[in-house]
Amino acid sequence: MIYEICTQTDPGLTRDNNEDAVAFDAATRLCILADGMGGYNAGEIASGMAAAFIKSEMGRWLSQAGRHANAKEVRRAMEICVENANHSIFNAANSNPQYAGMGT
């Protein structure tokens, strides 16, 4: 089966910069969309971090265990990846004043 993936994001009418991020892992057919928190600091950084982190971690998990996993195991792996991405973003925001308050 051949997949064709197209993505497009739009900052909308209120914001000048686009704070959304999209990532795709062809090997695992994993697609991630992270929506930066508009109106807050560095939303584009947070969404980029989240998309990259989840692509890496969930992609690795799917490559190793995903073929034999049931829906409950996949859901739990997704929850863990999102929680870990959130911790990473929170730590970056606390370590860098220019990222204070960022989120996705």
Model-derived regions: residue spans:
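PP2C/PPM-type serine/threonine phosphatase catalytic domain
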Residues: 1-104
